[in-house]
Amino acid sequence: MRPPQLPEQPVGVVRAEHLTRLLRTYEGRDFTSRRDSAIILLLVDTGMRRAECVGMTLDDLDLDQRIVWVLGKGRRPRALPIGRKTAQALDRYLRVRDEHRLSHLPHLWVGRNGPMTPSGIYQVVHDRARAAGLPAMHPHQLRHAFATSWLAEGGNENELMLVAGWKSRIMVDRYTKATAVERARASHARLPPADRL
């Protein structure tokens, strides 16, 4: 006897306007604002996992080439491209980090008492979402936002697998299903059959 098949859980999608509101909560020039802004932008821009984010060191950044290195699941290293805004946010964070009392640590992300933990990254996203008046949000939702945006904008599925660090197509298929309705709607808007009659 086989267990019953459970329905596949749809991938929750963070709306673009929510991401914009989330990023607007970082207007300050203080250490925490600069750090949190860089974390959020990095998560949104790369889709990295929070464990990958928290595991980064200063040596994992190449801001001139706009590439960051992460150690993914199975301890597989990956190079992730970043955009101009993310590189700028990281540069601003590094400048205030240099003045932090824990600047001697090799860890990229530091807090009051030491290197940040996965729960610290979770707290950054959760607290900033609350400050923006948004529904509860967690770091993995930013990974979802990255993947769905990549596909919705016509990004290559094989490249997404590489950047996201997935070994199988199962995850790509989940995200493809999540964006299928939006992609069909956009295609129909470009090619409405009845409008050509």
Describe each PLM feature range.
Residues 1-197:
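Conserved catalytic core of the tyrosine transesterase superfamily
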